[in-house]
């Protein structure tokens, strides 16, 4: 028992000296002398313990109740973190806490010797000095953008390339090499903008945009290269196709990409396909079809069923490639001369009723609604419903519609009949009043 007590006193002395040295060190760094009295109190407590002796229970209680104890000049919390004296912020490291305290005190010790810039953080001064030296160590992997700060690079990736930070493991070096090879293959294909490749598996697969079906008959190679797989497009055959590793850019950027690629195609490829020529063997169009609204389809089918007389030579065929019509157009000639109604939409494809097989040359075409009539009388009646200045304004009641679908639904709802009955009733009342 007599040998253990001096060892305990030596340990307490060393601990008190360590606390004193750390306190003076912190005071020299922060420039504050407010904790001198606390250090003297700790030293006085140490001398008293040397003179009067120190029993073990007092030391154990002071270490257990260390929530309010000053260590290194700062107050510690119950979990051992250093607590800020101005707010509830706590940190494990002293340097991080000192930087935080400078927010309250307004101290900015890190100053630029070339301009009046000053900051409380050393890393901010390092980033500022790069503006004087012109150094830009952070480079974007998708383009030639370079910057001097990491936060600017993250903002550039989110704003320019629509890349969101994904939680998970970082891609390995092999994935980075594979990504670089894919980017070279894509750039060799002549894209104006590079396709984004997500090295970590995304949460969902991006579906093919619907409006790209307008270019299905003109650029079949782009469809297979951009949407089936980039590895299949590259003739090396080194990379395997994995649909989860490909992330298509947003629709607007992809549309501009296809438009630029279309402008760079040869003249013979840009010409629209004639109805006599069949589809290319490599063409794999992803046209999504949907039946028209029930009311509109019934009205149009009735008009076509009632028409039996041949069309006059005034009918002019227009071989446009829009697939957003409630009635089928000559775009379906490439598949067996059988016209089917098709609407490019994001809904899954469903079978649609087929119209009687008839030569599109004999059909009358409404360019506003993209509808075809086999009878000249029905065509004339339909064209009389369009306004002169605004084709989507009803010529009967004057109702202005947004597009051809709203225009067709306007007649399907019978709004014109109700308006005509009201007008006739008003004219009758006026006649009776007179």
Curated annotation (Swiss-Prot):
Region span, Disordered: 33-57, 260-357
GO molecular-function terms, A-Z: chromatin binding; DNA binding; zinc ion binding
Alphabetically ordered keywords of this record: DNA-binding, Metal-binding, Nucleus, Repeat, Repressor, Transcription, Transcription regulation, Zinc, Zinc-finger
Taxonomic superkingdom: Eukaryota
Residue ranges, compositional bias (Low complexity): 296-313
Listed GO CC annotations: nucleus
Matching Gene3D superfamilies: Classic Zinc Finger
InterPro entries membership: Ikaros_C2H2-ZF, Znf_C2H2_sf, Znf_C2H2_type
Biased composition (Polar residues): 260-274, 337-349
Zinc fingers classed as C2H2-type: ranges: 82-104, 110-132, 138-161, 364-386, 392-419
SUPFAM superfamilies assigned to the protein according to its UniProt record, in alphabetical order: beta-beta-alpha zinc fingers (SSF57667)
Subcellular location: Nucleus
Subunit details: Probably self-associates.
Family recorded in the similarity comment: Belongs to the Ikaros C2H2-type zinc-finger protein family.
Additional detail: 'Pegasus' was the winged horse in Greek mythology.
Purpose: Transcriptional repressor that binds the core 5'GNNTGTNG-3' DNA consensus sequence.
UniProt-listed PANTHER family: ZINC FINGER PROTEIN, ZINC FINGER PROTEIN PEGASUS
Protein name per Swiss-Prot or TrEMBL: Zinc finger protein Pegasus
Species of the source: Xenopus tropicalis (Western clawed frog)
Upper lineage: Eukaryota, Metazoa, Chordata, Craniata, Vertebrata
Name of the coding gene: ikzf5
């Amino acid at each position: 028992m007599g040998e253990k007590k001096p060892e305990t006193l030596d340990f307490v002395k060393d601990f008190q000296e360590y606390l004193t040295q750390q306190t003076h060190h912190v005071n020299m760094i922060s420039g504050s002398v407010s904790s001198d009295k606390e250090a003297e109190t700790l030293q006085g407590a140490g001398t008293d313990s040397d003179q009067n002796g120190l029993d073990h229970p007092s030391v154990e209680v002071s270490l257990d109740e260390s929530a309010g104890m000053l260590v290194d000049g700062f107050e510690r919390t119950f979990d051992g973190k250093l607590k800020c004296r101005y707010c509830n912020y706590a940190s494990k490291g002293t340097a991080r806490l000192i930087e935080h305290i400078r927010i309250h005190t307004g101290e900015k010790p890190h100053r630029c010797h070339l301009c009046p810039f000053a900051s409380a953080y050393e890393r901010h001064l390092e980033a500022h000095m790069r503006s004087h030296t012109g150094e830009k160590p952070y480079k974007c992997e998708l383009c030639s953008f370079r910057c001097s700060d990491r936060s600017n690079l993250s903002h550039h990736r989110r704003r320019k390339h629509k890349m969101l930070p994904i939680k998970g493991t970082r891609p390995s070096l092999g994935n980075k090499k594979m990504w670089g090879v894919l980017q070279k293959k894509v750039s060799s294909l002549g894209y104006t903008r590079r396709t984004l490749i997500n090295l970590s598996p995304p949460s969902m697969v991006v579906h093919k945009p619907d409006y790209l079906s307008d270019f299905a008959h003109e650029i079949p190679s782009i469809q297979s290269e951009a949407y089936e797989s980039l590895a299949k497009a590259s003739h090396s055959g080194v990379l395997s196709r994995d649909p989860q590793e490909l992330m298509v850019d947003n629709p607007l950027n992809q549309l501009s990409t296809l438009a630029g690629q279309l402008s760079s195609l040869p003249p013979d490829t840009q010409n629209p396909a004639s109805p006599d020529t069949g589809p290319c063997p490599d063409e794999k169009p992803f046209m999504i079809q949907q039946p028209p609204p029930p009311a509109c389809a019934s009205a149009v089918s009735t008009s076509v069923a009632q028409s039996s007389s041949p069309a006059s030579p005034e009918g002019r065929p227009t071989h446009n490639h829009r697939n957003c019509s409630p009635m089928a157009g000559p775009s379906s000639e490439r598949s067996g001369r059988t016209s089917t109604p098709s609407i490019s939409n994001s809904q899954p494809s469903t079978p649609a009723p087929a119209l009687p097989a008839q030569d599109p040359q004999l059909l009358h075409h409404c360019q506003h609604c993209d509808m075809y009539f086999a009878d000249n009388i029905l065509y004339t009646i339909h064209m009389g419903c369009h306004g002169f200045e605004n084709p989507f304004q009803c010529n009967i009641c004057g109702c202005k519609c947004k597009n051809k679908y709203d225009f067709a639904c306007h007649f399907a709802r019978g709004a014109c009949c109700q308006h005509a009955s009201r007008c006739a009733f008003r004219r009758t009342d006026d006649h009776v009043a007179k």
